[in-house]
UniProtKB/Swiss-Prot annotation:
It comes from the Bacteria. The keyword RNA-binding does not apply. PANTHER family: MAJOR FACILITATOR SUPERFAMILY MULTIDRUG TRANSPORTER MFSC. The chain crosses the membrane at residues 17-37, 53-73, 86-106, 107-127, 142-162, 165-185, 201-221, 230-250, 273-293, 299-319, 334-354, 357-377, 403-423, 435-455. It comes from Staphylococcus aureus (strain NCTC 8325 / PS 47). Pfam families: MFS_1 (PF07690). Keywords: Antibiotic resistance, Cell membrane, Membrane, Transmembrane, Transmembrane helix, Transport. GO terms for biological process: response to antibiotic; transmembrane transport. This is Quinolone resistance protein NorB.
Amino acid sequence: MEKPSREAFEGNNKLLIGIVLSVITFWLFAQSLVNVVPILEDSFNTDIGTVNIAVSITALFSGMFVVGAGGLADKYGRIKLTNIGIILNILGSLLIIISNIPLLLIIGRLIQGLSAACIMPATLSIIKSYYIGKDRQRALSYWSIGSWGGSGVCSFFGGAVATLLGWRWIFILSIIISLIALFLIKGTPETKSKSISLNKFDIKGLVLLVIMLLSLNILITKGSELGVTSLLFITLLAIAIGSFSLFIVLEKRATNPLIDFKLFKNKAYTGATASNFLLNGVAGTLIVANTFVQRGLGYSSLQAGSLSITYLVMVLIMIRVGEKLLQTLGCKKPMLIGTGVLIVGECLISLTFLPEIFYVICCIIGYLFFGLGLGIYATPSTDTAIANAPLEKVGVAAGIYKMASALGGAFGVALSGAVYAIVSNMTNIYTGAMIALWLNAGMGILSFVIILLLVPKQNDTQL
């Protein structure tokens, strides 16, 4: 077993602030492009398809590599991987802002995805190592403020910065925040697992995972254009299924697998991770709702982002409330309450058939419930996943949990956008938005069922 270095060092506020700042480089800054797509089209003189690739590729690459990065953090050092992630974000941000070349935009966004893959599992592992009991729950609350809170603020933040300062300032500010995070984390003792032998990295598993996820993403985003009977669609589907099947077989046989499926023998961990995937999938709500009010109601990006102010306020307030509910009620009840409230919010935002003034009111209230629900859910879910991971595997476990976050967001956005486009072309944008938002509500309902069935009433059983 790993000897926790927290015996010699205890986490403090300086380290925690550095961790939170590193986390928001992805969840706040990198995700802010979700509300500035038309501006990027003009700035880079390119089409919406290219911009959509740039917007989604960050979360996709984060999800593909986050598990591998979690394993590297366990082996070679969590502080080291965090610092590498922060430096990668600076590099990616520079590539994005130095020119108007679309290729550099995509490469920069790809590098930001790798940055997030390093930062997320490594920082969760640092919290596991250096914070104990209520201090750990407090640290996870602030970590959740950086992730869930950042995702809540990103739509309004991106629209506001792009309108008032110019979109490049999103990444200039991200570079400044990254430098501050590096300074605050500097001097923290390294923490790594001593029980994992430095075996050869699972390259085969990583390659298969990348092939599977890229194929699946293309099927979702381009499926309607390709046609389900086309040779390319069928080929991609076969590649996705084949690579997934081979990945499962190889990972179960590997001595040092990329994903340790033994972690999923714990129902609490499985429930937290699966529900986390689905509730991050409802990020598609922001894409659909923002696009609808801009195209259907004629709103600007700043006006569209302003509708979600209640979301960002509530998610920031309720994350600490979720922490207190975790301490008093255990993990299951807050996760169920949060998910249930979120579903109500989704239903309100989906009422696109209403007159404009009534729909705006429903949006404001719906986003309030949306943020309230996610805020209550965030800390209990994260704590459930981390608390049920063995210390020597916490980096990999955190990596899988955050892979669920990133891939849930990436595929939720892709699937919601695809449904919105298909139904809108068949009917109108009002119906298209409503059906796409119902899809997000459905993911919330499925998440509720998973929590109900898998997460125990008292989270006291650990691997």
